[in-house]
Amino acid sequence: MLREVWLDIGVEKVDMYEGITVKVLLDSGVTEMFIDQKMAARHGFRLQKLERPIVVRNVNGTNNSAGAITYQVEVNMCYKSHIERIRMDVCNLGKTDIILGML
């Protein structure tokens, strides 16, 4: 049984058309989109401060040790011939660069 779905997606800085191709994890159990904070910094994505932090909880209900989500980025996401402007919450994803939730 297939447990993970990975896609090659283009991600561009908004209004700069300067992008990269990255493998993203498609997660049907998540409704939001996330980008790893180290990846966002490494590629110079512009961080936008959230008005209210988003508390992150672990599966067991405890607060995540990395703390709350306080920033997001806006990017152009490109898959095949489709381009969509999206916002992703910035957090620590470990070995995964981007998680795309199912909206």
PLM regions with names:
Residues 2-4, 8-10, 16-103:
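Aspartic protease
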